Regions:
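Cysteine-rich micro-motifs
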Residues: 44-60
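Long, charge-rich boundary regions
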Residues: 63-137
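Catalytic-core elements of nucleic-acid end-processing and repair enzymes
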Residues: 174-177, 186-188, 192-368
Length: 368
């Protein structure tokens, strides 16, 4: 079905809110407003300023070039025959010193979403043989296309503020679009994924954003805690930090069903405190594992190399002696910062490791 053309207000929004008018600044601090053509003086260190003649907010570019262009996407969300439609337009902006800027708006893609979450894509042809997934051929028609990864990469955060939603999306808690999230993925998740719907309805937008970015990966571990959070009216403001905090609690064996842990008053402070505890816990575990490995390998090393124990070479300054235990291998590796212990040289039957010292200070490790 052919959708109606955009009204002038929606077209004007794309030209004024999606692309940024440019102010070209020379080395003398003279800024040319490419929107109205007037020249004014401004040496601000900021990257933006307001033209005193036309009131346009300008993006300052310190350059000598005369031609400028921008290409951005604009999205409009509407409905048609009970289907949710996301219309994607390419906004092309061309400006030249001394001339009126030119704007073009071309519809390049439509995502049609059914109430059951299934969707299809109408799009123009794309040029092949380039490294860009959005080299649109404007002369081609909007036609039904096979779904490819490229269409999922084409989305924008510049969405026209007035949106129309199908009743099913409203029933699932949707009232607006989420910044930083592909709108198609967001709508489909609300229609098909109960967890996404729940997060939206309980007001956990940051958790929903994090959930969608990770495609729900590993959220089974967090879901019982999310229920506790919802029951206690706690709002997670930094979802990534909160999930990392729960991972630390889980590894430390804390109760993830307790509001005491999952609803911290100061998330950053509690996160940092438990990360310190976790690092200490991991170090103690590594020491225990290392000690167990040393005890396990000690007997075999003693049997294999006992006949060399006590062997040493020395003069007035240097002393070279055989390492007589696995624990000495560990101490040697730590002191000399090499892999004599970590690579298991004490297990090698065809090698003999010696340590060279001067006045008891290690200077070299020798392999025979």
């Amino acid at each position: 079905k052919k959708l109606p053309n955009l009204p002038p207000a929606q077209i004007g929004w794309a030209f004024t809110h999606v692309v940024e008018p440019i102010g070209r600044r020379t080395s003398k601090g003279e800024i040319t407003c490419l929107d109205c053509g007037e020249v004014f003086h401004n040496t601000t260190k900021h990257k933006q300023c307001v033209c005193p003649h036309c009131g346009t907010k300008l993006l300052i570019e310190d350059t000598r070039k005369l031609n400028f262009k921008q290409r951005e996407y604009a999205a409009y969300i509407t409905t048609s025959d009970g289907l949710q439609v996301i219309r994607i337009f390419m906004v092309d902006y061309y400006a030249k010193i001394g001339k009126t800027p030119r704007y073009y708006l071309n519809e390049v893609m439509q995502r049609w979403i059914a109430p059951n979450g299934k969707f299809c894509t109408m799009a123009r042809l794309r040029a092949w043989g380039t490294r860009y997934c959005d080299s649109w051929i404007y002369s081609s028609d909007l036609e039904l296309r096979n779904e490819t990864w490229a269409y999922g990469q084409i989305y924008t955060y510049d969405v026209y503020p007035r949106i129309n939603l199908i009743p099913e999306l409203k029933q699932h808690g949707c009232r607006k679009v989420l910044h930083d999230i592909n709108t198609t993925d967001y709508f489909v998740a609300l229609l098909m994924d109960n967890r996404a719907e729940t997060l939206m309805k309980i007001g956990q937008e940051e958790l929903l954003r994090h959930y969608l970015k990770r495609s729900g990966w590993n959220f089974d571990r967090y879901w019982p805690s999310i229920r506790i959070v919802a029951r206690n009216g706690y709002i997670v403001k930094d979802a990534s930090l909160w999930c990392d905090y729960l991972d630390a609690l889980w590894e430390l064996g804390k109760d993830l069903h307790s509001p005491k842990y999952v609803c911290p008053e100061n998330l950053r402070e509690e996160h940092d405190r438990y990360v310190v505890k976790l690092n200490r816990h991991r170090e103690e575990r590594r020491k225990a594992e290392r000690e167990a490995l040393i005890l396990e390998c000690e007997e075999a090393y003693q049997q294999a190399k006992a006949r060399f124990f006590g062997l040493s070479f020395h003069d007035e300054k240097i002393c070279i002696h055989v390492l007589e235990s696995v624990r000495e291998f560990f101490a040697e590796g730590e002191a000399m910062h090499h892999c004599v212990y970590s690579n298991g040289y004490y297990r090698k039957d065809d090698s003999l490791i010696l340590s060279a010292t001067i006045d008891g200070k290690r200077i070299e490790t020798c392999l025979l």
